[in-house]
Amino acid sequence: MFLAGVLCMCAAAASALFGSWSLCHTPTADPTALALRAMAPTQLAAAVMLAAGGVVAVAAPGHTALMVVIVCIAGAVGTLAAGSWQSAQYALRRETASPTANCVGSCAVCTQACH
């Protein structure tokens, strides 16, 4: 279980690093950067779950540690999946709501002023 604990802690550190990196960048209108920034809170939550699983894997008895590690990994993966889905939906909604999204290059029939 020691190896599983170390791997969980390394995954937690990587997730926390990517989450912090996403939060440190300035907000932009780019949908990809927006989706990455929206993923940061779920990455940090997954990092906390993985760190807890890693600590329990190192400190607790074998059977208990195995159960907790499985639950923590499943929770972290589920959190990242739900966060990806939500941030992608948010970025798409924001992109379609922008006023420049209606201008698709057909200037001959356009009645709007160019931005």
Swiss-Prot record:
Mode of membrane association: Multi-pass membrane protein
Keywords for the protein's UniProt record, in alphabetical order: Cell membrane, Membrane, Transmembrane, Transmembrane helix
Keyword flag Transmembrane helix: yes
Main location: membrane
GO cellular component: plasma membrane
Statement: the UniProt record of this protein carries the keyword ATP-binding: no
Transmembrane segments: 1-21, 33-53, 54-74
Localization of this protein: Cell membrane
Family statement: To M.leprae ML0030.
The protein's name: Uncharacterized protein MT0044
Species per Swiss-Prot/TrEMBL record: Mycobacterium tuberculosis (strain CDC 1551 / Oshkosh)
